[in-house]
């Protein structure tokens, strides 16, 4: 199984990156936290979780081992697959996730698309003790240094990313209307603003 990849970034989008490793392009699914940390181009190293299904082999990549550990912890829960685990990590940073699990904060957990009250309860029940043992403090804050794009292009990318995370179109349009999208705002900055509003 693939556990680590280092290569040149051939393509980067909010939900995946293509890493060119010695002429072979690997499509790696990533959470927003990893997207924020990756450069637009150049070399990158990702900690990989390989998911083998009947019809596909999918790679999920993370900037830190701790983030990967949280992902693996999430998929150990019945009913949480790799895509939903990635979406959870796209909506809430590991330190906040650990705190929500330890405090039994069902409201915060069930605010994540795809997580209902019963799933939130199951997450707390199964992961409350385990989450505290992971070193969530080693995860970077994720300050984004992104490319500047025309506002229309930024909003299109953000809208697409939010819909991919499970938010409904009317919800996304409402949030995008509230955002402050200055001409110099990057996709990363606008995504962070949108997720803050959606997680209230």
Curated annotation (Swiss-Prot):
Transmembrane segments: none annotated. Disulfide bonds: none annotated. It holds the Pfam family HHH_5. Residues 1-63 are annotated as: Domain I. Keywords: Cytoplasm, DNA damage, DNA recombination, DNA repair, DNA-binding. Residues 143-153 are annotated as: Flexible linker. The keyword DNA damage applies. SMART domains: HhH1 (SM00278). Homotetramer. Forms an RuvA(8)-RuvB(12)-Holliday junction (HJ) complex. HJ DNA is sandwiched between 2 RuvA tetramers; dsDNA enters through RuvA and exits via RuvB. An RuvB hexamer assembles on each DNA strand where it exits the tetramer. Each RuvB hexamer is contacted by two RuvA subunits (via domain III) on 2 adjacent RuvB subunits; this complex drives branch migration. In the full resolvosome a probable DNA-RuvA(4)-RuvB(12)-RuvC(2) complex forms which resolves the HJ. The RuvA-RuvB-RuvC complex processes Holliday junction (HJ) DNA during genetic recombination and DNA repair, while the RuvA-RuvB complex plays an important role in the rescue of blocked DNA replication forks via replication fork reversal (RFR). RuvA specifically binds to HJ cruciform DNA, conferring on it an open structure. The RuvB hexamer acts as an ATP-dependent pump, pulling dsDNA into and through the RuvAB complex. HJ branch migration allows RuvC to scan DNA until it finds its consensus sequence, where it cleaves and resolves the cruciform DNA. NCBIfam families: ruvA. Belongs to the RuvA family. Has three domains with a flexible linker between the domains II and III and assumes an 'L' shape. Domain III is highly mobile and contacts RuvB. This is Holliday junction branch migration complex subunit RuvA. It comes from Trichlorobacter lovleyi (strain ATCC BAA-1151 / DSM 17278 / SZ).
